[in-house]
C-alpha cells in the first residue's frame, strides 16, 4: 500500500518544494498539525514557522515559512506561503547560513516572543540531528 502524499510549497518566486512524502507537520494559526495520506479535506491559515517534512526514507527536511495557507486533500497538500527558506545544506557553513536566514525570515514576521522561542528551538534542535 502506498502511504505517500503529494506535497508542494509555492511562494511568489515559484515552487519551492514538490514531491511525495510520508507526513508533513504544519505551523497552523491555532497550533501545529500533522497530515498523512487520507487526511480529511481542509483549508487552514498558517503562521510563520517551520514545516517538518518526513520523506519516504523517514529522513526529515525543514523549511521555514512566512505566513500562508494550506489546502489539504486526501492525497495532496498544497502550501501557499509569502516566503520560504530551506533549513539544510551540503556543509556546516551553508547550514548555518540557511538557519540564520530562516530565523531572520520568521523574526521579521512575528511579534509573539513565545512562538519565536519555540520556532528557534525547533530550528536549533534540527541542526543537531
Swiss-Prot record:
UniProt-listed Gene3D superfamilies: F0F1 ATP synthase delta/epsilon subunit, N-terminal
Domain of life: Bacteria
Membrane topology: Peripheral membrane protein
UniProt keyword list: ATP synthesis, Cell inner membrane, Cell membrane, CF(1), Hydrogen ion transport, Ion transport, Membrane, Transport
InterPro entries: ATP_synth_F1_dsu/esu, ATP_synth_F1_dsu/esu_N, ATPsynth_dsu/esu_N
One GO location term (cellular component): proton-transporting ATP synthase complex
Pfam families assigned to the protein according to its UniProt record, in alphabetical order: ATP-synt_DE_N
Coiled coil feature spans: none
Major localization listed first in the record, in broad terms: membrane
Location in or out of the cell: Cell inner membrane
MF (Gene Ontology): ATP binding; proton-transporting ATP synthase activity, rotational mechanism
Classification via NCBIfam families: ATP_synt_epsi
Subunit relationships: F-type ATPases have 2 components, CF(1) - the catalytic core - and CF(0) - the membrane proton channel. CF(1) has five subunits: alpha(3), beta(3), gamma(1), delta(1), epsilon(1). CF(0) has three main subunits: a, b and c.
HAMAP family, alphabetized: ATP_synth_epsil_bac
Cited function: Produces ATP from ADP in the presence of a proton gradient across the membrane.
Family: Belongs to the ATPase epsilon chain family.
Name by which UniProt lists this protein: ATP synthase epsilon chain
Species whose genome carries this gene: Campylobacter jejuni subsp. jejuni serotype O:6 (strain 81116 / NCTC 11828)
